[in-house]
Amino acid sequence: MGCNKRGVTRQEDDFSAWYNEVVAKAGLIDRGPAKGTMVIRPYGYRIWELLQDELDSKIKELGHENAYFPMLIPENYFNREAEHVEGFHPELAVVTHAGGKELSEPLVIRPTSETVIGDMMAKWITSHRDLPLRLNQWSNVVRWELRPRMLLRTIEFLWQEGHSAHIEKSDALRETLFALDIYTTLARDMAAIPIVSGEKTAGERFAGALNTYTIEAMMRDGKALQSATTHYLGDNFARAFNIRYTTAEEQQAFVHTTSFGLSTRMIGAIVMVHGDDKGLVLPPQVAPYQVVIVPITTGNKASEVGHAAADLARRLQAAGVRTHVDARPQLTPGWKYNEWELRGVPIRLELGPRDLEAGTTVMVRRIGEKAKQPIAIAAAPTELPGILEEFQRTLLERATQFRDDHTTLVDNWDAFATTVATGWALAIHCGNPECEEDIKAETAATPRCVPRQGAPATGRCIRCDAPSAYDKRVIFARAY
């Protein structure tokens, strides 16, 4: 096993070690004091803010309003919906004592908010005139992970969860697909991740849902990462929490509810989709700094170079480019170059006395064969926005090519087992949860989704030879 000069393990040697080292050394996260928890450092949190700002605006366009609900939920709320409590029980963190006394009823620390929001909906909805009701919450949640992995599966994480209540089933189903489209666009346009969207099989559904939809992304090791989900909950939670309304005909009816969520694991997806042996590679749309200027302040022109770097930064920021000047005097330019490569900054500008005399700066792209070239200082504010757009497109195209190259249509069991070791398999599936358990036991692969855009296909199950439960092939992969 080898490391590069930054002390980062090569991906091909140990992808898991590479990931753990990069998220820490690039300044995204640190480990929290309690096992399985994490601290999101400012650099990582800024990525989350950029995703959050875009997603929040799109969710509001869908008609959702932000609200906040309690983190502590009475335990009996979870017992009202049998499938929900069964699905979440192993992950629940429960408070039994407070104020030096045992509580009369244990309180669950929020793993998700369908229960408490359902209780509030029952108070707020009385008439068909109150519908649809659309709510959104930005919060932390706690799920007691036995095998935590930073940003992907931690005991506590940040997320967005949307909830809605509707008169018609068709409207609720449409809401789940609208939310899925929002997530798809966010992943593609902001994170440069070419996801596949589709419906989960019965065995992979959210606890208490009738339909669960997902966006799945392929990581650089060929594994899948479920990056966001949306759920049609039918009237399950409406019945459990008595969410009724009076119809126009003065009859009582239950609402149809939905929920959908995206978390900080999207940051982990960005790391594993785009990163390389040098460290992070950040899409410009989510990069805290799109450009870092490194002034080379040696000799008698140090002050002049420093002022020129600051002036260039101001003009770039005025052009809408997030820019940082690394003027730390205690570090050499070479050290700074390596650090900002590790931290994934899309473009680095090197500016020294000779560059200043020539009226140019050396532009270094984080990726590409011809990564280094001079650019006129005067032209930088007009040229760099377009160069950043090209960088964003290149990352998306590169990730799309990698996904397509590692997705294989398979029709026999031997080929299936070989394929899921390094990528995704498109296979016929019977839809039986017991068959899915057998597949997982033998290959560690699970059904990721029935793709929305998949071509029609029929046949016999890849594992048990039973008839297909779907009119398409199913994506199987090992997953995080």
Curated annotation (Swiss-Prot):
GO terms for biological process: prolyl-tRNA aminoacylation. Keywords: Aminoacyl-tRNA synthetase, ATP-binding, Cytoplasm, Ligase, Nucleotide-binding, Protein biosynthesis. It catalyses: tRNA(Pro) + L-proline + ATP = L-prolyl-tRNA(Pro) + AMP + diphosphate. GO terms for molecular function: ATP binding; proline-tRNA ligase activity. It holds the Pfam family HGTP_anticodon. Its EC number is 6.1.1.15. InterPro entries: aa-tRNA-synt_IIb (IPR002314), aa-tRNA-synth_II (IPR006195), aa-tRNA-synth_II/BPL/LPL (IPR045864), Anticodon-bd (IPR004154), Anticodon-bd_dom_sf (IPR036621), Pro-tRNA-ligase_IIa (IPR002316), Pro-tRNA-ligase_IIa_arc-type (IPR004499), Pro-tRNA_ligase_II_C (IPR016061). GO terms for cellular component: aminoacyl-tRNA synthetase multienzyme complex; cytoplasm. The keyword ATP-binding applies. Homodimer. HAMAP family: Pro_tRNA_synth_type3 (MF_01571). Consists of three domains: the N-terminal catalytic domain, the anticodon-binding domain and the C-terminal extension. Belongs to the class-II aminoacyl-tRNA synthetase family. ProS type 3 subfamily. Catalyzes the attachment of proline to tRNA(Pro) in a two-step reaction: proline is first activated by ATP to form Pro-AMP and then transferred to the acceptor end of tRNA(Pro). This is Proline--tRNA ligase. It comes from Mycobacterium leprae (strain TN).
